[in-house]
Amino acid sequence: MRRIWNDLTSMRLLPALFTCICLISCSQDTTTENQRSAYYWSTTWQMDSSKMNFIQKHHIKRLYVRFFDVVRDADGEIMPNATLQFETTDENMTAEEKKSKSLMPKGLEIIPVVYIVNDCFKANTKTNPIRSNKSGRKSSDETPRQLADKILNRILQMNEANDIENVKEIQIDCDWTASTQEAYFEFLHILKENAKDKKMQLSATIRLHQLSMTPPPVDRGILMMYNTGDVKQLSCQKPILDMKDVAPYIQHLGSYPLPLSAAYPLFSWRVLFREGKFIGIIHTDDDFPVLPSDSIVVRKPEMSDIMEAVRSINYQNEDINSEVILFDLNTDNIKRFKSEDYEKIFNHRSNSSSI
């Protein structure tokens, strides 16, 4: 267990890989320009020219970078998974090309993100469950603390190994529910205190259905304005973003007690259906065998959907859009729309109107 959590060889790390990360200049006029940010959600770090140009052209100053997932393995043990690899491994590239694609762009604030599968906070018959010590059950009092320690240590190790400096915040992404809330919140409370000792804040993602629940014990939240419908239903035309699904959840955003920023979707899905039944989301051509009678449908938010979401958030609580985050910085995603369309998302204040 300890060896796996501390084993960083699978990351293909390069010493002194990154240039120094510097925070946004203190001289920037934050009163007139909102924070422009994006998620980087992949298992391999590659900063090609299209991503670099997008970052520079749209003045993106903050990247939320997925570092690794946390899952239960076949034996029920909680383990890190799908750790981000920073070295480019394309054998067709020269050493110089690999280095350039591995470098972190200058002037970016990096926020490491860890996705934790909700099952990690549920009881498990094969091992001690992650469970709040308030339950009074034996053998689990320190389990949330152990998980918090392991996650923070792994983040710090990855930062150090890759020369990622000046990290001021870390983030946890988890689709927690009422049944896991107590254990998850205790874990967050411990992690927040540990991060504070390292002079870092803690943020967490907030899904729409979680808005009606007690806010998590973190410094701030990121409201996920996507995955709003049921992708498994062929009749659901807008599973990524449909404001008809969103509207009931955001009516009381003005009184939500946790500071929020909002993340908006750029991505699309290719969804496979067989005889009207959901088979899966196709990420690569080898994911599923496709029969002649199968249906492959593309689900994607249009610019009108994204702008409606931005305006709706403005109407409910304009402060949330003081930081606009795009999900995510993928080559296909950043080519979906025209440059001026992305600017419309970022320049929401000048394009907002009452709805």
What are these regions (language model features)?
Residues 44-56, 144-161, 210, 305-314:
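Short, acidic/polar
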Residues 182, 186-274:
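Substrate-binding surface in catalytic domains of secreted glycosidases
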Residues 24-25:
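C-terminal motif of bacterial Sec signal peptides marking the signal peptidase cleavage site
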Residues 267-269, 275-355:
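Substrate-binding cleft of secreted/luminal carbohydrate-active enzymes
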Residues 63, 172, 221, 262, ...:
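Conserved, mostly hydrophobic/aromatic
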Residues 31, 37, 69-71, 75-223:
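Chitinase-like catalytic core of GlcNAc-active glycosidases
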Residues 49-72, 161-163:
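Catalytic domains of carbohydrate-active enzymes, especially glycoside hydrolases
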